[in-house]
């Protein structure tokens, strides 16, 4: 076992050859590299599978032995300072490694089909493999300096992937927004790291925790400065995990390809913030104010994310706000000290959310055959509906993910969310009420997404896409979206070979799509069904990862069932996390009996079903005449009270749809303020600073020109002027001082 741990340092570097070889191949042998491009997808999956097997083996060793392994290489710069590099293998590392690799493999397989017609295919897989390398390096780091290095690499990869189609202005703006927002948190993280190094003299986690605990115990530190440094460290997690108030980048990150959304929201970027807080929890737990701040930020994010998801029309943005809310649950659990519950929910949510995002990608893929390449249309739930008849497998798996996030047993998120809800009562009744109410909101908005997408009738009618001439679909060039020439087809990239990784079937894209010339948000009447094309189910290459993630969603919750009945211990997760739990809570007991579990579960499931019922009542087409996704039913008679109620509902709807006006506030006060300051600085620099400098030169030039014309070149003239000046000076002197 010791030898296995000794080779664990290689984990982050196994996927690294793929982006390096792709880059070298495109420079040295571009034609051959592009011709055999699907070979790189196979290598990406193969190398990440090796990491997954290695990570699973390490996890089994840890479950059996409850061991933690750390290895450090020291680079001594001078006698007073040495920089250490190493790797740490503990339960948190193994959990994150398995999450990254399992979800990453599914996303890579899925992407082989999803990105098959994109000329940036090779660039996409290079970025994805480098993303996996960065995240694996982050979770295996043994000190804060290494974490910061890989932390920045994760941010870089997310910037590249969110802006993958950067020729689209919205995608370019989205990646810049994500980058700048995360720079705020990253700057705080760097300052916090340097602050704690100044306090403890170490970057290594074990030394840092031990030294800091001794300093706190002996009251040898400035508590205010320590709190400030801890807040700065936490700021990095707030930005990376899209917690309030640095959450604004997350919905815009949906401008990247859908597989990227699945990876970012499930196991990489947003999970990095939760990982950082979990890793530093032994540091935070001795600072009570920080733990309370973490829980407050978590509960605000829980409620805010859920309310902002209520009115979203874009299916990916709705799921993005769902991610924000669920990350808030994890942050709340960490702030309450519920280390096990937070990591359990991280695991279950990762598989459920990856399933939902890949399912949404399958839906978008099928809608593009009708509306063409237009994210504003293909991702709009107002143009969907009735897809259960056309994409039945996607519908079943999407329903599994939806019910899991709703908290319906026996699906994965039921077990983890229930633990967080129960722990919240022990921490704060106010927090508990908000958390339980938000669980009902979660069920409401998730089932709203499901009903708008799959129930009713297909809301796209080609008569709404006016125009006598058919127009081709868009192809996506190497550097983004680019219109193809007329009468060209999207599937002409390579007609001589199969385009899919697991299947040789080709599906031609229907050419019946038309450009839309009228507002597409007005949903046509359901009785008008004259459509000339319908969506179809995705290829097996996309369905296989969705099916596997569906199995994870069904069964992964079993690892954390907290029952210990009659000597039968089903709680694998507690045994897995034993070293970390014992470090944080030496006398903790996570087991429950059946009676206690059933009492809590009945309440949470009832709340979830109530949210589902309200969503079904409002959004199921049979019972509702909703149009444009509003919350108004026409069967209620109008009256003064009803009109007031409608105004309130519309106000809430506008508040939710417009992201609580937080983005507008930031744009007006922060972005506008910075632009105003920049304009003033530019004016001051050009008119004042440059004016002074240029003014000296102009004055010198004028004086020189004047002197040039006064001097004639004769000595007699110079003597005459000299004597005249002296005479005038003497005359003035005599007149001024003659009285004295």
UniProtKB/Swiss-Prot annotation:
The chain crosses the membrane at residues 9-29, 40-60, 89-109, 125-145, 147-167, 185-205, 219-239, 258-278, 286-306, 327-347, 354-374, 396-416, 425-445, 543-563, 602-622, 717-737. InterPro entries: NADH_UbQ_OxRdtase_chlpt_su5_C, NADHpl_OxRdtase_5_subgr, ND/Mrp_TM, NU5C-like, Proton_antipo_N. It is a multi-pass membrane protein. The keyword NADP applies. One of its GO terms (cellular component) is chloroplast thylakoid membrane. Keywords: Chloroplast, Membrane, NAD, NADP, Plastid, Plastoquinone, Quinone, Thylakoid, Translocase, Transmembrane, Transmembrane helix, Transport. Signal peptide: none annotated. It is found in: Plastid, Chloroplast thylakoid membrane. GO terms for molecular function: NADH dehydrogenase (ubiquinone) activity; quinone binding. NDH shuttles electrons from NAD(P)H:plastoquinone, via FMN and iron-sulfur (Fe-S) centers, to quinones in the photosynthetic chain and possibly in a chloroplast respiratory chain. The immediate electron acceptor for the enzyme in this species is believed to be plastoquinone. Couples the redox reaction to proton translocation, and thus conserves the redox energy in a proton gradient. Belongs to the complex I subunit 5 family. This is NAD(P)H-quinone oxidoreductase subunit 5, chloroplastic. It comes from Solanum bulbocastanum.
């Amino acid at each position: 076992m010791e030898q296995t741990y000794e080779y664990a340092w290689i984990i982050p570097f196994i996927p690294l050859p793929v982006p390096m070889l792709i880059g070298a191949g495109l420079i040295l042998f571009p034609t051959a590299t592009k011709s055999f491009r699907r070979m790189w997808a196979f290598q990406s999956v193969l190398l990440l599978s090796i990491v997954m097997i290695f990570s699973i083996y390490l996890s089994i060793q840890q479950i059996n032995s409850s061991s933690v392994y750390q290895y450090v290489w020291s680079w001594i710069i001078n006698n007073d300072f040495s920089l250490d590099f190493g790797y740490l293998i503990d339960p948190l590392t193994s959990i994150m490694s398995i999450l990254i690799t399992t979800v990453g493999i599914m996303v890579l397989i899925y992407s082989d089909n999803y990105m098959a017609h994109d000329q940036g295919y090779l660039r996409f897989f290079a970025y994805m493999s480098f993303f996996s390398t960065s995240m694996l390096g982050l979770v295996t780091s043994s000190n804060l300096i290494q974490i910061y290095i890989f932390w920045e690499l994760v941010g870089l990869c997310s910037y590249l992937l969110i802006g993958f189609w950067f020729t689209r202005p919205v995608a370019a703006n989205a990646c810049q927004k994500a980058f700048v927002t995360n720079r705020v948190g990253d700057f705080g993280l760097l300052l916090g790291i340097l602050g704690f190094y100044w306090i403890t003299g170490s970057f290594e986690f074990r030394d840092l925790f031990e030294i800091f605990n001794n300093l706190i115990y002996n009251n040898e530190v400035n508590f205010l400065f320590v709190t400030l440094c801890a807040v700065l460290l936490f700021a990095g997690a707030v930005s990376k995990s899209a917690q309030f108030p640095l959450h604004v980048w997350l919905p815009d990150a949906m401008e990247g390809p859908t597989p990227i959304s699945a990876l970012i929201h499930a196991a990489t970027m947003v999970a990095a913030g939760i990982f950082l807080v979990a890793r530093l929890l032994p540091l935070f737990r001795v600072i009570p104010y920080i733990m309370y701040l973490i829980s407050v930020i978590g509960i605000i994010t829980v409620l805010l994310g859920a309310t902002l998801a209520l009115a979203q029309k874009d299916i990916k943005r709705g799921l993005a706000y769902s991610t924000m809310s669920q990350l808030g649950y994890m942050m709340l659990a960490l702030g309450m000290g519920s280390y096990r519950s937070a990591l359990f929910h991280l695991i279950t949510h990762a598989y459920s959310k990856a399933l939902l995002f890949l399912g949404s990608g399958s839906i978008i893929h099928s809608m593009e055959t009708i509306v063409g390449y237009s994210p504003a249309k293909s991702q709009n739930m107002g143009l969907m509906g009735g897809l259960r008849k056309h994409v039945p497998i996607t519908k079943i798996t999407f329903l599994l993910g939806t019910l899991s996030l709703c908290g319906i047993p026996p699906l994965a998120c039921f077990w983890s969310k229930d633990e967080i809800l129960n722990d919240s009562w022990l921490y704060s009744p106010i927090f508990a009420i908000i958390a339980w109410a938000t669980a009902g909101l979660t069920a409401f908005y998730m089932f709203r997404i499901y009903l708008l997408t799959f129930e009713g009738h297909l809301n796209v009618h080609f008569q709404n896409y006016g125009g006598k001439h058919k127009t081709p679909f868009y192809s996506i060039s190497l550097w983004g979206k680019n219109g193809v020439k007329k009468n060209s087809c999207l599937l002409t990239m390579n007609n001589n070979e199969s385009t899919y990784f697991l299947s040789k079937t080709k599906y031609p894209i229907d050419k019946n799509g038309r450009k839309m010339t009228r507002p597409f948000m007005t949903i046509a009447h359901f009785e008008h069904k004259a459509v000339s094309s319908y969506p179809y189910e995705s290829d097996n290459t996309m369905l296989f990862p969705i099916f596997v993630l569906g199995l994870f969603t069904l069964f992964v919750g079993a690892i954390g069932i907290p029952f210990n009945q009659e000597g039968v211990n089903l709680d694998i997760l507690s045994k897995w996390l034993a070293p970390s739990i014992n470090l944080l809570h030496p006398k903790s007991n996570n087991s429950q009996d059946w009676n206690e579990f059933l009492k809590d579960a009945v309440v949470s499931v009832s709340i979830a079903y109530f949210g589902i019922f309200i969503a079904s009542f409002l959004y199921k087409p049979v019972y509702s005449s909703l149009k444009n996704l509003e919350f108004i039913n026409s069967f209620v008679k109008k009256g003064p009270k009803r009109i007031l109620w409608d105004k309130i509902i519309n106000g809430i709807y506008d508040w939710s749809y417009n992201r609580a006006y937080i983005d507008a506030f930031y744009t007006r006060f922060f972005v506008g303020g910075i632009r105003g300051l920049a304009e003033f600085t530019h004016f001051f620099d050009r008119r004042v600073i440059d004016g002074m400098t240029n003014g000296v030169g102009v004055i010198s030039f004028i004086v020189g020109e004047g002197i040039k014309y006064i001097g004639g070149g004769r000595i007699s003239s110079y003597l005459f002027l000299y004597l005249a000046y002296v005479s005038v000076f003497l005359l003035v002197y005599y007149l001024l001082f003659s009285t004295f």
